[in-house]
């Protein structure tokens, strides 16, 4: 998946605002960032999930990994865009979007 496609999927969610900051695109809902594209470098993104949401989604794709350190243990998740499939991208972004709004981000659906 390209960074532009990832941003397009995120932009399809309700009330999403995109803002470029220092070369990365920050995606927010209700003033809370739920994903950043182009960080930690080009071809990557980072999403904020709960630890349970992170675990559930990481079981579905090798494109996700916890950020090293404390932030990763709290659900901050690195996304390798080039290996991320469309269906999983939608689930990842929906989960991060819901988490930013204080809703459950845990999926029980199988990979697909």
What role is predicted for each listed range?
Residues 1-112:
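Charge-dense, helix-prone N-terminal extensions
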């Amino acid at each position: 998946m390209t960074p532009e496609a990832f941003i397009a999927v995120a932009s399809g969610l309700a009330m999403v605002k995109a803002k470029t900051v220092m070369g990365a695109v920050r995606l927010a809902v209700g003033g809370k960032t739920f994903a950043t594209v182009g960080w930690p470098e080009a071809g990557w993104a980072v999403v904020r999930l709960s630890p349970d949401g992170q675990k559930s989604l990481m079981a579905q794709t090798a494109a996700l990994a916890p950020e090293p350190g404390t932030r990763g243990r709290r659900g901050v998740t690195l996304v390798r865009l080039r290996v991320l499939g469309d269906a999983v991208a939608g689930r990842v972004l929906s989960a991060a979007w819901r988490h930013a709004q204080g809703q459950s981000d845990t999926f029980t659906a199988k990979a697909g």
